[in-house]
UniProtKB/Swiss-Prot annotation:
Required for endonucleolytic cleavage during polyadenylation-dependent pre-mRNA 3'-end formation. Residues 1-15 have a biased composition (Polar residues). The keyword Transit peptide does not apply. This is Protein CLP1 homolog. It comes from the Eukaryota. ATP binds at E55, K94, D156, S157, G158, K159, S160, S161. It comes from Dictyostelium discoideum. The keyword ATP-binding applies. Its main location: nucleus. Keywords: ATP-binding, mRNA processing, Nucleotide-binding, Nucleus.
Amino acid sequence: MSNDNSVNINNFSSMNGGGGGSDIQFPLKPSQQQQQQQQNSINQSTIRTLEITQELRYEIDFDQNGWMKLIEGTAECFGTELSLNKVYKLSGTKGAVFTWTGCKIEITNNCQPYIGEKTPMPQYAGVYQELDAFRVSILDEPKKSGPRVIIVGPTDSGKSSLSKILLAYSARSGYQPLFVDLDPGQGSITIPGTISAAHIQNPLDIEEGLAGGIPLAHFYGHTSLDVNPDLFKALCKNLASFIDKQLDSSNISRISGFIANTCGWIDGLGYKILLQNIDVFKANLIIVMDNEKLYSDISSHYSQKDNSIKIIKLPKSGGVFIRPPVFRKKTRMNRIKEYFNGINDNLSPHYIVLDFKDVSIYRTGGGPAAPASALPIGTSSQIDPLQITEVYPSLDMCHSIFAISYAKQASNIFHSNVAGFLYVSDIDMETKKITVISPAPGPLPSRFLLLGTLKWMEN
Protein backbone atom coordinates (compact mmCIF):
# COMPACT_ATOMS: atom_id res chain seq x y z
CA MET A 1 0.00 0.00 0.00
CA SER A 2 1.65 3.20 -1.07
CA ASN A 3 0.96 6.90 -1.15
CA ASP A 4 2.95 10.05 -1.63
CA ASN A 5 4.17 9.88 1.96
CA SER A 6 4.81 6.15 2.18
CA VAL A 7 7.93 4.86 3.83
CA ASN A 8 8.62 1.46 5.29
CA ILE A 9 8.24 2.09 8.99
CA ASN A 10 8.77 -1.47 10.17
CA ASN A 11 12.08 -0.01 11.01
CA PHE A 12 11.13 3.46 9.85
CA SER A 13 11.77 3.31 7.16
CA SER A 14 8.17 0.58 9.27
CA MET A 15 5.47 0.75 11.68
CA ASN A 16 4.67 -2.84 12.28
CA GLY A 17 6.70 -3.16 14.77
CA GLY A 18 -6.88 0.33 29.84
CA GLY A 19 -5.71 3.36 30.35
CA GLY A 20 -3.55 5.48 28.19
CA GLY A 21 -0.76 7.22 29.98
CA SER A 22 0.19 4.52 32.45
CA ASP A 23 3.82 3.42 32.41
CA ILE A 24 4.46 0.09 30.76
CA GLN A 25 7.25 -1.89 32.40
CA PHE A 26 9.14 -4.98 31.37
CA PRO A 27 9.06 -7.99 33.71
CA LEU A 28 12.31 -8.81 35.47
CA LYS A 29 14.54 -11.39 33.84
CA PRO A 30 13.99 -14.85 35.33
CA SER A 31 16.62 -16.23 37.71
CA GLN A 32 18.88 -19.12 36.70
CA GLN A 33 16.71 -21.55 38.68
CA GLN A 34 13.56 -20.21 37.03
CA GLN A 35 15.21 -20.53 33.62
CA GLN A 36 16.09 -24.16 34.34
CA GLN A 37 12.55 -24.92 35.51
CA GLN A 38 11.22 -23.25 32.40
CA GLN A 39 13.57 -25.27 30.19
CA ASN A 40 12.44 -28.50 31.86
CA SER A 41 8.83 -27.54 31.19
CA ILE A 42 9.63 -26.78 27.55
CA ASN A 43 11.20 -30.19 27.12
CA GLN A 44 7.96 -31.85 28.23
CA SER A 45 5.45 -32.18 25.43
CA THR A 46 2.41 -34.25 24.60
CA ILE A 47 0.76 -35.38 21.38
CA ARG A 48 -2.88 -34.43 21.03
CA THR A 49 -5.14 -36.15 18.50
CA LEU A 50 -7.89 -33.99 17.01
CA GLU A 51 -10.92 -35.35 15.22
CA ILE A 52 -12.65 -33.60 12.29
CA THR A 53 -13.65 -29.95 13.13
CA GLN A 54 -12.08 -30.00 16.57
CA GLU A 55 -9.60 -27.40 17.76
CA LEU A 56 -6.65 -27.43 20.14
CA ARG A 57 -6.66 -24.36 22.37
CA TYR A 58 -3.56 -23.06 24.10
CA GLU A 59 -2.46 -20.27 26.41
CA ILE A 60 1.09 -19.40 27.44
CA ASP A 61 2.41 -16.60 29.65
CA PHE A 62 4.76 -13.83 28.50
CA ASP A 63 7.64 -15.16 30.61
CA GLN A 64 7.28 -18.67 29.16
CA ASN A 65 8.50 -20.17 25.89
CA GLY A 66 6.85 -23.18 24.29
CA TRP A 67 6.25 -24.69 20.89
CA MET A 68 3.88 -26.78 18.84
CA LYS A 69 4.30 -28.98 15.78
CA LEU A 70 1.84 -30.57 13.35
CA ILE A 71 2.94 -34.19 12.96
CA GLU A 72 0.01 -35.68 11.03
CA GLY A 73 -2.95 -34.42 8.99
CA THR A 74 -3.80 -30.80 8.23
CA ALA A 75 -4.59 -27.89 10.53
CA GLU A 76 -4.75 -24.11 10.58
CA CYS A 77 -4.26 -21.32 13.10
CA PHE A 78 -6.43 -18.23 12.55
CA GLY A 79 -6.86 -19.33 8.94
CA THR A 80 -3.16 -19.94 8.28
CA GLU A 81 -2.19 -23.50 7.37
CA LEU A 82 0.41 -25.20 9.56
CA SER A 83 3.34 -26.80 7.77
CA LEU A 84 3.93 -30.46 8.56
CA ASN A 85 6.72 -31.09 11.10
CA LYS A 86 7.59 -27.40 11.45
CA VAL A 87 8.19 -26.18 15.01
CA TYR A 88 6.24 -23.02 15.86
CA LYS A 89 7.55 -21.07 18.85
CA LEU A 90 4.94 -19.67 21.25
CA SER A 91 5.22 -17.06 24.00
CA GLY A 92 2.80 -14.60 25.59
CA THR A 93 -0.10 -15.65 23.40
CA LYS A 94 -3.48 -17.35 23.37
CA GLY A 95 -4.92 -19.14 20.39
CA ALA A 96 -6.34 -22.26 18.80
CA VAL A 97 -5.43 -24.72 16.05
CA PHE A 98 -8.41 -25.96 14.04
CA THR A 99 -8.62 -28.98 11.74
CA TRP A 100 -11.12 -29.80 8.99
CA THR A 101 -9.66 -33.28 8.45
CA GLY A 102 -8.34 -34.47 11.79
CA CYS A 103 -4.70 -34.22 12.84
CA LYS A 104 -2.06 -34.87 15.47
CA ILE A 105 -0.20 -32.01 17.13
CA GLU A 106 2.74 -32.15 19.51
CA ILE A 107 2.72 -29.25 21.95
CA THR A 108 4.59 -28.33 25.12
CA ASN A 109 2.73 -28.66 28.39
CA ASN A 110 3.37 -25.04 29.42
CA CYS A 111 0.96 -24.01 26.65
CA GLN A 112 -1.84 -25.52 28.77
CA PRO A 113 -3.41 -27.25 25.74
CA TYR A 114 -6.90 -28.71 25.69
CA ILE A 115 -9.25 -29.87 22.94
CA GLY A 116 -12.47 -28.00 22.19
CA GLU A 117 -15.23 -29.85 20.35
CA LYS A 118 -17.69 -26.99 19.89
CA THR A 119 -16.34 -24.33 17.56
CA PRO A 120 -17.99 -21.72 15.30
CA MET A 121 -15.33 -22.21 12.60
CA PRO A 122 -17.84 -23.69 10.11
CA GLN A 123 -19.94 -20.54 10.52
CA TYR A 124 -16.87 -18.32 10.10
CA ALA A 125 -15.93 -20.23 6.96
CA GLY A 126 -19.47 -19.74 5.71
CA VAL A 127 -19.09 -15.98 6.08
CA TYR A 128 -15.88 -16.12 4.07
CA GLN A 129 -17.65 -18.06 1.33
CA GLU A 130 -20.19 -15.22 1.15
CA LEU A 131 -17.36 -12.69 0.81
CA ASP A 132 -15.78 -14.78 -1.92
CA ALA A 133 -19.05 -15.09 -3.83
CA PHE A 134 -19.60 -11.34 -3.59
CA ARG A 135 -16.11 -10.65 -4.93
CA VAL A 136 -16.70 -12.96 -7.87
CA SER A 137 -20.04 -11.28 -8.61
CA ILE A 138 -18.45 -7.83 -9.09
CA LEU A 139 -15.45 -8.88 -11.18
CA ASP A 140 -16.88 -7.21 -14.27
CA GLU A 141 -18.60 -4.32 -12.51
CA PRO A 142 -15.85 -1.68 -12.09
CA LYS A 143 -18.08 0.78 -10.25
CA LYS A 144 -18.87 -1.65 -7.43
CA SER A 145 -16.70 -2.08 -4.36
CA GLY A 146 -15.88 -5.43 -2.81
CA PRO A 147 -16.64 -6.36 0.81
CA ARG A 148 -16.37 -3.43 3.20
CA VAL A 149 -16.60 -5.37 6.45
CA ILE A 150 -16.71 -3.89 9.94
CA ILE A 151 -16.59 -6.32 12.86
CA VAL A 152 -18.16 -5.03 16.09
CA GLY A 153 -18.79 -6.47 19.52
CA PRO A 154 -17.85 -6.23 23.19
CA THR A 155 -14.37 -6.79 24.54
CA ASP A 156 -13.15 -10.40 24.34
CA SER A 157 -15.83 -11.50 21.88
CA GLY A 158 -13.44 -12.78 19.20
CA LYS A 159 -13.36 -9.76 16.85
CA SER A 160 -9.59 -9.92 16.31
CA SER A 161 -9.68 -13.69 15.76
CA LEU A 162 -12.40 -13.41 13.12
CA SER A 163 -10.50 -10.56 11.42
CA LYS A 164 -7.39 -12.73 11.12
CA ILE A 165 -9.37 -15.69 9.79
CA LEU A 166 -11.18 -13.68 7.10
CA LEU A 167 -7.93 -11.96 6.09
CA ALA A 168 -6.03 -15.26 5.94
CA TYR A 169 -8.70 -16.99 3.85
CA SER A 170 -8.80 -13.98 1.51
CA ALA A 171 -5.03 -13.99 1.06
CA ARG A 172 -5.01 -17.75 0.47
CA SER A 173 -7.53 -17.18 -2.33
CA GLY A 174 -5.31 -14.60 -4.02
CA TYR A 175 -7.03 -11.44 -2.80
CA GLN A 176 -5.28 -8.48 -1.18
CA PRO A 177 -7.73 -6.99 1.33
CA LEU A 178 -6.96 -4.01 3.49
CA PHE A 179 -6.87 -4.67 7.21
CA VAL A 180 -8.17 -1.62 9.05
CA ASP A 181 -7.39 -1.45 12.77
CA LEU A 182 -9.71 0.93 14.62
CA ASP A 183 -8.75 -0.27 18.10
CA PRO A 184 -6.07 2.05 19.55
CA GLY A 185 -5.90 -0.07 22.68
CA GLN A 186 -4.49 -3.03 20.78
CA GLY A 187 -2.27 -1.85 17.94
CA SER A 188 -2.49 -4.93 15.72
CA ILE A 189 -0.70 -3.28 12.78
CA THR A 190 1.66 -0.77 14.37
CA ILE A 191 1.69 0.12 18.07
CA PRO A 192 -1.08 0.98 20.55
CA GLY A 193 -2.38 4.53 20.35
CA THR A 194 -2.81 4.47 16.57
CA ILE A 195 -5.44 3.69 13.97
CA SER A 196 -4.00 2.20 10.82
CA ALA A 197 -4.45 0.21 7.63
CA ALA A 198 -2.30 -2.18 5.60
CA HIS A 199 -2.72 -4.41 2.57
CA ILE A 200 -2.64 -8.11 3.50
CA GLN A 201 -1.11 -10.23 0.74
CA ASN A 202 -0.24 -13.30 2.83
CA PRO A 203 -1.89 -15.13 5.75
CA LEU A 204 -0.63 -14.13 9.17
CA ASP A 205 2.64 -15.57 10.37
CA ILE A 206 1.82 -17.89 13.26
CA GLU A 207 4.83 -16.71 15.26
CA GLU A 208 4.99 -13.05 14.22
CA GLY A 209 1.36 -12.13 13.52
CA LEU A 210 -0.03 -10.14 10.63
CA ALA A 211 2.47 -9.49 7.86
CA GLY A 212 1.00 -6.62 5.90
CA GLY A 213 2.51 -4.22 3.42
CA ILE A 214 3.67 -0.73 4.31
CA PRO A 215 1.03 0.55 6.75
CA LEU A 216 -0.55 3.96 6.94
CA ALA A 217 -1.17 5.15 10.47
CA HIS A 218 -2.64 8.14 12.26
CA PHE A 219 -1.43 8.84 15.79
CA TYR A 220 -4.26 9.13 18.28
CA GLY A 221 -1.83 8.99 21.19
CA HIS A 222 -4.04 7.24 23.74
CA THR A 223 -5.21 3.68 24.31
CA SER A 224 -8.74 4.60 25.38
CA LEU A 225 -11.34 6.29 23.14
CA ASP A 226 -12.83 8.41 25.91
CA VAL A 227 -9.64 10.44 26.40
CA ASN A 228 -10.37 12.42 23.22
CA PRO A 229 -13.34 10.95 21.31
CA ASP A 230 -13.63 13.92 18.94
CA LEU A 231 -10.03 13.52 17.84
CA PHE A 232 -10.57 9.79 17.36
CA LYS A 233 -13.63 10.38 15.18
CA ALA A 234 -11.81 12.98 13.10
CA LEU A 235 -8.82 10.68 12.54
CA CYS A 236 -11.18 7.88 11.49
CA LYS A 237 -12.63 10.20 8.84
CA ASN A 238 -9.11 10.89 7.56
CA LEU A 239 -8.36 7.17 7.42
CA ALA A 240 -11.66 6.40 5.67
CA SER A 241 -10.81 8.90 2.94
CA PHE A 242 -7.49 7.14 2.41
CA ILE A 243 -9.25 3.75 2.26
CA ASP A 244 -11.56 5.00 -0.49
CA LYS A 245 -8.56 6.10 -2.56
CA GLN A 246 -6.82 2.78 -2.01
CA LEU A 247 -9.81 0.73 -3.11
CA ASP A 248 -10.01 2.85 -6.27
CA SER A 249 -6.29 2.48 -7.00
CA SER A 250 -6.43 -0.96 -8.64
CA ASN A 251 -8.89 -3.65 -9.65
CA ILE A 252 -7.54 -6.17 -7.14
CA SER A 253 -7.90 -3.61 -4.33
CA ARG A 254 -11.45 -2.78 -5.38
CA ILE A 255 -12.51 -6.42 -5.47
CA SER A 256 -10.68 -7.39 -2.27
CA GLY A 257 -12.23 -4.66 -0.11
CA PHE A 258 -11.35 -4.34 3.56
CA ILE A 259 -11.84 -6.01 6.94
CA ALA A 260 -12.04 -3.58 9.88
CA ASN A 261 -11.64 -4.47 13.54
CA THR A 262 -13.06 -2.16 16.22
CA CYS A 263 -12.66 -1.67 19.95
CA GLY A 264 -15.01 -3.15 22.54
CA TRP A 265 -16.73 0.06 23.68
CA ILE A 266 -20.28 -0.56 22.43
CA ASP A 267 -22.57 1.54 24.62
CA GLY A 268 -23.19 5.25 25.08
CA LEU A 269 -20.64 7.34 23.22
CA GLY A 270 -18.86 4.18 22.10
CA TYR A 271 -22.00 3.07 20.24
CA LYS A 272 -22.29 6.47 18.54
CA ILE A 273 -18.67 6.23 17.40
CA LEU A 274 -19.38 2.75 15.99
CA LEU A 275 -22.29 4.10 13.94
CA GLN A 276 -20.18 6.97 12.64
CA ASN A 277 -17.44 4.60 11.53
CA ILE A 278 -19.93 2.32 9.79
CA ASP A 279 -21.07 5.38 7.84
CA VAL A 280 -17.72 7.02 7.05
CA PHE A 281 -16.13 3.73 5.98
CA LYS A 282 -19.23 2.97 3.86
CA ALA A 283 -19.57 -0.55 5.27
CA ASN A 284 -21.71 -2.99 3.32
CA LEU A 285 -21.39 -5.83 5.85
CA ILE A 286 -21.52 -5.51 9.62
CA ILE A 287 -20.62 -8.57 11.68
CA VAL A 288 -21.82 -8.42 15.29
CA MET A 289 -19.97 -10.73 17.64
CA ASP A 290 -21.72 -12.32 20.59
CA ASN A 291 -24.12 -9.54 21.60
CA GLU A 292 -27.88 -9.72 21.04
CA LYS A 293 -28.59 -6.13 22.09
CA LEU A 294 -25.93 -4.63 19.83
CA TYR A 295 -27.21 -6.70 16.91
CA SER A 296 -30.77 -5.55 17.58
CA ASP A 297 -29.80 -1.89 17.96
CA ILE A 298 -27.71 -1.77 14.78
CA SER A 299 -30.32 -3.72 12.80
CA SER A 300 -33.04 -1.32 13.92
CA HIS A 301 -30.91 1.73 13.14
CA TYR A 302 -30.08 0.71 9.58
CA SER A 303 -33.47 -0.79 8.74
CA GLN A 304 -34.75 2.79 8.83
CA LYS A 305 -31.74 4.28 7.09
CA ASP A 306 -29.91 1.98 4.67
CA ASN A 307 -31.22 -1.39 3.55
CA SER A 308 -28.11 -2.01 1.43
CA ILE A 309 -26.07 -2.87 4.53
CA LYS A 310 -26.14 -6.52 5.52
CA ILE A 311 -25.94 -7.26 9.24
CA ILE A 312 -25.14 -10.71 10.60
CA LYS A 313 -24.59 -12.09 14.07
CA LEU A 314 -21.92 -14.64 14.96
CA PRO A 315 -21.13 -16.47 18.19
CA LYS A 316 -17.73 -16.22 19.78
CA SER A 317 -15.56 -19.28 20.00
CA GLY A 318 -15.41 -21.20 23.24
CA GLY A 319 -11.66 -20.70 22.94
CA VAL A 320 -11.88 -16.90 23.24
CA PHE A 321 -10.07 -16.01 26.45
CA ILE A 322 -11.04 -13.27 28.85
CA ARG A 323 -8.02 -10.96 28.97
CA PRO A 324 -7.58 -9.38 32.41
CA PRO A 325 -6.17 -5.83 32.64
CA VAL A 326 -2.70 -7.14 33.48
CA PHE A 327 -2.63 -9.25 30.31
CA ARG A 328 -3.83 -6.31 28.20
CA LYS A 329 -1.12 -4.09 29.66
CA LYS A 330 1.55 -6.71 28.98
CA THR A 331 0.27 -7.09 25.42
CA ARG A 332 0.59 -3.35 24.83
CA MET A 333 4.05 -3.43 26.40
CA ASN A 334 5.05 -6.23 24.07
CA ARG A 335 3.76 -4.46 20.95
CA ILE A 336 5.93 -1.40 21.69
CA LYS A 337 8.92 -3.58 22.58
CA GLU A 338 8.57 -5.48 19.30
CA TYR A 339 8.46 -2.23 17.34
CA PHE A 340 11.88 -1.20 18.62
CA ASN A 341 13.54 -4.58 19.24
CA GLY A 342 11.86 -6.92 16.76
CA ILE A 343 9.67 -9.97 17.35
CA ASN A 344 12.53 -12.08 18.66
CA ASP A 345 14.82 -9.22 19.72
CA ASN A 346 16.39 -9.41 16.28
CA LEU A 347 16.57 -5.64 15.76
CA SER A 348 19.08 -3.21 17.22
CA PRO A 349 17.43 0.12 18.03
CA HIS A 350 19.55 3.26 17.85
CA TYR A 351 20.07 6.08 20.33
CA ILE A 352 19.74 9.52 18.76
CA VAL A 353 20.41 12.83 20.51
CA LEU A 354 18.21 15.71 19.35
CA ASP A 355 18.63 19.42 20.07
CA PHE A 356 15.53 21.17 21.35
CA LYS A 357 15.84 23.64 18.46
CA ASP A 358 15.75 20.88 15.85
CA VAL A 359 12.33 19.48 16.74
CA SER A 360 8.84 20.82 17.31
CA ILE A 361 6.65 18.85 19.71
CA TYR A 362 2.88 19.08 19.39
CA ARG A 363 0.06 17.82 21.55
CA THR A 364 -3.50 17.60 20.26
CA GLY A 365 -6.38 19.03 22.25
CA GLY A 366 -4.41 21.91 23.73
CA GLY A 367 -3.00 19.77 26.56
CA PRO A 368 -4.03 16.92 28.85
CA ALA A 369 -7.73 16.72 29.64
CA ALA A 370 -9.88 14.48 31.78
CA PRO A 371 -11.63 11.65 29.91
CA ALA A 372 -15.22 12.42 28.90
CA SER A 373 -16.42 9.76 31.33
CA ALA A 374 -14.72 11.59 34.23
CA LEU A 375 -16.44 14.95 33.66
CA PRO A 376 -19.53 15.96 35.67
CA ILE A 377 -22.84 15.05 34.02
CA GLY A 378 -23.96 17.74 31.59
CA THR A 379 -20.52 19.33 31.25
CA SER A 380 -17.92 19.11 28.52
CA SER A 381 -14.24 19.94 28.19
CA GLN A 382 -13.49 23.54 27.19
CA ILE A 383 -10.35 22.41 25.35
CA ASP A 384 -10.66 22.16 21.58
CA PRO A 385 -10.03 18.43 20.97
CA LEU A 386 -8.64 19.14 17.50
CA GLN A 387 -6.39 22.03 18.47
CA ILE A 388 -2.71 21.53 17.72
CA THR A 389 -0.58 23.06 20.48
CA GLU A 390 3.21 23.24 20.46
CA VAL A 391 4.73 22.29 23.81
CA TYR A 392 8.24 22.87 25.13
CA PRO A 393 10.31 19.80 26.09
CA SER A 394 10.01 18.91 29.77
CA LEU A 395 11.11 16.16 32.11
CA ASP A 396 7.62 14.67 32.29
CA MET A 397 8.03 13.64 28.64
CA CYS A 398 10.59 11.01 29.65
CA HIS A 399 9.41 7.50 28.74
CA SER A 400 6.83 8.93 26.33
CA ILE A 401 6.29 7.75 22.78
CA PHE A 402 6.65 10.37 20.05
CA ALA A 403 5.11 9.88 16.62
CA ILE A 404 6.96 11.46 13.70
CA SER A 405 4.55 13.35 11.47
CA TYR A 406 4.93 13.49 7.70
CA ALA A 407 3.61 17.06 7.75
CA LYS A 408 5.72 19.65 5.94
CA GLN A 409 4.28 22.44 8.07
CA ALA A 410 2.53 22.57 11.43
CA SER A 411 -0.87 23.41 9.96
CA ASN A 412 -0.92 20.03 8.17
CA ILE A 413 -0.11 17.87 11.20
CA PHE A 414 -3.69 16.83 11.89
CA HIS A 415 -4.28 15.56 8.34
CA SER A 416 -0.90 13.83 7.91
CA ASN A 417 -0.04 10.23 8.63
CA VAL A 418 3.04 9.30 10.63
CA ALA A 419 6.40 7.93 9.56
CA GLY A 420 7.29 6.04 12.72
CA PHE A 421 7.81 6.30 16.45
CA LEU A 422 10.48 7.32 18.96
CA TYR A 423 10.93 6.43 22.61
CA VAL A 424 12.08 9.28 24.86
CA SER A 425 14.92 7.89 26.94
CA ASP A 426 16.14 11.12 28.54
CA ILE A 427 15.66 14.89 28.51
CA ASP A 428 18.47 17.19 29.66
CA MET A 429 17.07 20.62 30.43
CA GLU A 430 20.55 22.13 30.93
CA THR A 431 22.06 21.07 27.61
CA LYS A 432 18.65 21.26 25.90
CA LYS A 433 18.94 17.81 24.38
CA ILE A 434 16.52 14.91 24.01
CA THR A 435 17.81 11.34 23.85
CA VAL A 436 15.47 9.08 21.91
CA ILE A 437 15.49 5.48 20.77
CA SER A 438 14.72 4.94 17.10
CA PRO A 439 14.28 1.66 15.20
CA ALA A 440 16.64 2.97 12.52
CA PRO A 441 19.69 5.25 12.33
CA GLY A 442 19.91 8.47 10.39
CA PRO A 443 18.05 11.78 10.37
CA LEU A 444 14.37 11.96 11.21
CA PRO A 445 11.91 12.22 8.31
CA SER A 446 10.41 15.37 9.88
CA ARG A 447 10.98 17.83 12.70
CA PHE A 448 7.33 17.57 13.80
CA LEU A 449 6.77 15.17 16.72
CA LEU A 450 3.38 14.25 18.18
CA LEU A 451 2.80 13.56 21.86
CA GLY A 452 -0.10 11.78 23.56
CA THR A 453 -0.38 9.96 26.88
CA LEU A 454 1.31 6.77 25.71
CA LYS A 455 4.28 5.82 27.90
CA TRP A 456 6.65 2.89 28.08
CA MET A 457 9.59 1.85 30.24
CA GLU A 458 12.62 0.63 28.30
CA ASN A 459 13.83 -1.67 31.09
